[in-house]
Amino acid sequence: IVTLDCEVKCSNGFPDPKIAQEEMLSITIKNHQSKRIVVWGVGKFTTDREDVTYVECESEVHLLKEFLIFWEKHLPDCISGWNTEFFDIPYICNRIKKLFGEDELKRLSPWGSVQEREVYKMGRNHQVYNIQGVAALDYLDLYKKFTYSAQESYRLDHIAKVELGESKDGNPYNTFSEWYQKDFQSFIEYNIQDVEIVDKLEDKM
């Protein structure tokens, strides 16, 4: 199982994964067994953590190429994350399609098949992708189904506080775009924190 989280630019409000017009800034994955983390990012980041590997990329195109090479070498049985079904997976798939075409998208699947469909949920249609041969567990969905108490918010930072007693670092700047433009180091640390929290929730559930 790998836990996945991506961050994208947001110059025009919250990015729509179906349109996927904003460039990707980073992808972070954590292997649930080895606990190792790999981050691809388009900026400077340094870490002395032995469990974190950072791949500095020149551009989003470079980032996605490196990510696909790694993915094919270390094909996971299952992807997990927080709202990955409706955000991270469709966003990554749509950017790959936009930049490289349909054939490159097929590289995500051991069977060379990635299928797109529409799902009606929370009062609207969502585009989702099924990566054939790779199971997907969205912990936001599982959490809603298997916990008995309704939460005032299902944001990951709120659930982390409720379930783990952990506070997630917030944005120290006025806007999200200011954050990644001015302090890429803490921005990536935030991205890493996301996969670590989901990994801990996974252990707990």
Where do the model's predicted regions map?
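Short amphipathic alpha-helical coiled-coil/interface segments
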Residues: N191-M205
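Non-transmembrane alpha-helical segments in soluble domains
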Residues: L68, C93, D199-E202
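Acidic beta-strand-to-loop metal/phosphate-binding motif
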Residues: D77-E85
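Short catalytic/ligand-binding loop motif for oxyanion handling, primarily in non-cytosolic enzymes
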Residues: N12, F86-Y91
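Conserved RNase H-like, two-metal-ion catalytic cores of nucleic-acid enzymes
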Residues: I1-C78
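Short, flexible loop/turn elements at secondary-structure junctions
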Residues: C6-C10, N31-Q33, E85, D138-Y143, ...
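Active-site-proximal helix-loop-helix substrate-binding element of RNase H-like nuclease domains
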Residues: I37-W40, T47-Y54, I89, K98, ...
